[in-house]
Amino acid sequence: MEIWINPACSKCRSAVQLLDAEGADYTVRRYLEDVPSEDEIRQVLDRLGLEPWDITRTQEAEAKELGVKEWARDASARDQWIKALAEHPKLIQRPIITADDGTAVVGRTDEAVRDALSR
């Protein structure tokens, strides 16, 4: 199990605390420092069952500068979104937990973190 976090994020800190409280075996990835590649983002999206626009923090200043709210949300624009996430990792929703069964969740709630633990 791996969790992608930004240590400054309260949701990330809460998720880590819950994982610790449950005695989970996991690896922390500080994704702003250890930036995921486009391929890694694709893999996580597949595991999440989501599209890149589903995990993009569209309210971030960088997102507004890029104009992502205006981008198409379909197969033709998928690579554009993934490239933006790789080049601007701050736009990636967090925390993302990759579960041992090959799936992943966006662990913004205790329920989502527990869901990842149960997989």
Swiss-Prot record:
CDD domains: ArsC_ArsC
PROSITE patterns hit by this protein: ARSC (PS51353)
UniProt keyword annotation of Oxidoreductase present: yes
Pfam families given in the database record: ArsC (PF03960)
Keyword flag Disulfide bond: yes
Keywords, comma-separated and alphabetical: Disulfide bond, Oxidoreductase, Redox-active center
Disulfide bonds: C9-C12
InterPro entries with a match to the protein in the record: Arsenate_reductase, Arsenate_reductase-like, Thioredoxin-like_sf
Gene Ontology terms, MF aspect: arsenate reductase (glutaredoxin) activity
Family (UniProt): Belongs to the ArsC family.
Protein name in UniProt: Uncharacterized protein in glnII region
Species whose genome carries this gene: Streptomyces viridochromogenes
